[in-house]
Amino acid sequence: MSSIVPSMHNNRTIIIGIVAGEASGDILGAGLIRTLKKYLKKVRFFGIGGPCMQSEDMKSWYNIEELSVMGFAEIVMKLPRLLYIRRNLARRFINLKPDVFIGIDSPDFNISLENRLKKRGIRTIHYVSPSVWAWRKKRIFALKKATDNILVILPFEKKIYDHFNIPCQFIGHSLADQIPLNPNKVSARQKLGIPHDVYCLAVLPGSRIREIKMLAHDFLVCAKLLKNNFPNLEILVPLTNQTSIKKFISVASTSVKYRVLSNQSAWEIMMAADASLVTAGTATLECMLVKCPMVVAYRMHPLTFMLAKHFINIPWISLPNLLAGHELVKEFIQNNCRPENLAQTLINLLNNNNQHIVLKKKFRQLHHSIRCNADEQAAYAVLRLIK
């Protein structure tokens, strides 16, 4: 890639603006920053990022959790603050004049910001396509106006943008590059101190506080029902920060014994598990990549669900099912997301070794399909825009 890094870039400091709005974007942003630093001797990063991006020397102007909102009701409640942050970011970036701005996911926040910056002559990239194939398709045209390039992580997304002659590049997902095709479950268990002869369930109630509030209690009730069938069951709960841990403990309120883990990545914990109970989102992708059987669940505010049901026109919400184009893993949404439903499906999964074999084979095929050296490709796209 060194051939696309002109020598002029080595004689001045390159400024890159970058905004991620949640934990999954923080992971992608950190990988991109790390890769760009390999090719640019003098480079600085400003915007909004979480602990992963900040560990790569990015200067974050706001706490990433301020952007991590979900559902109609919560967005309305926090809208004044979100609008203030976006206005302030636009002002700061216009004054800073970064060589490139990258908005990672969070389309409702980032597309408008990208549009303002592009009008001021700042090159822009949107990293992770919004779900235009599911709802609000007109965002395609907003992206066309707001960006110089779109980096998509799912294979079928590129065709959508190609149809409208919008610059777009399929790069896969950096987690697919990071996670081995053949995960070592024995080693993963040893690191966590889990005996080889016990059942292990990973419980992932989400990265947002609202998700934890909606799902944590029922997830643990499900785990308790599961423990009645598997008395030696070990329950692991990966959570990323103290705010999430405190909320989980306050909401959980059940007598079942569990272990909260914050020093390991979610995928390392799921690699050690026999099955996972997962909130819809990036965690379903991580679970697929470590070849762990899963049950997917989601619940949202009733008003948000009513609106979503009216506008969204896809049969599945989990990434494994979307990638496969058919149901690979069971999904339980809203009123179907009940502990007894989740527990019975997990019991069936744990008792069906043949299903494990079929799932793991399919998961491996899907892993291959998005293992495309994403960080390098994303960095290449950024470097091409730097004048």
From Swiss-Prot:
Enzyme type, top EC level: transferase
Pfam families listed in its UniProt record: LpxB (PF02684)
GO biological process terms, semicolon-separated: lipid A biosynthetic process
Cross-referenced InterPro entries: Glyco_trans_19
EC number: 2.4.1.182
Keywords: Glycosyltransferase, Lipid A biosynthesis, Lipid biosynthesis, Lipid metabolism, Transferase
Pathway(s) annotated for this protein in UniProt: Glycolipid biosynthesis; lipid IV(A) biosynthesis; lipid IV(A) from (3R)-3-hydroxytetradecanoyl-[acyl-carrier-protein] and UDP-N-acetyl-alpha-D-glucosamine: step 5/6
GO molecular function annotation: lipid-A-disaccharide synthase activity; phospholipid binding
Catalytic activity, reaction form: 2-N,3-O-bis[(3R)-3-hydroxytetradecanoyl]-alpha-D-glucosaminyl 1-phosphate + UDP-2-N,3-O-bis[(3R)-3-hydroxytetradecanoyl]-alpha-D-glucosamine = lipid A disaccharide (E. coli) + UDP + H(+); a lipid X + a UDP-2-N,3-O-bis[(3R)-3-hydroxyacyl]-alpha-D-glucosamine = a lipid A disaccharide + UDP + H(+)
Highest taxon listed in the record's lineage: Bacteria
Gene Ontology CC annotation, any one: membrane
Function noted in UniProt: Condensation of UDP-2,3-diacylglucosamine and 2,3-diacylglucosamine-1-phosphate to form lipid A disaccharide, a precursor of lipid A, a phosphorylated glycolipid that anchors the lipopolysaccharide to the outer membrane of the cell.
The family this protein is said to belong to: Belongs to the LpxB family.
Name of this chain's protein: Lipid-A-disaccharide synthase
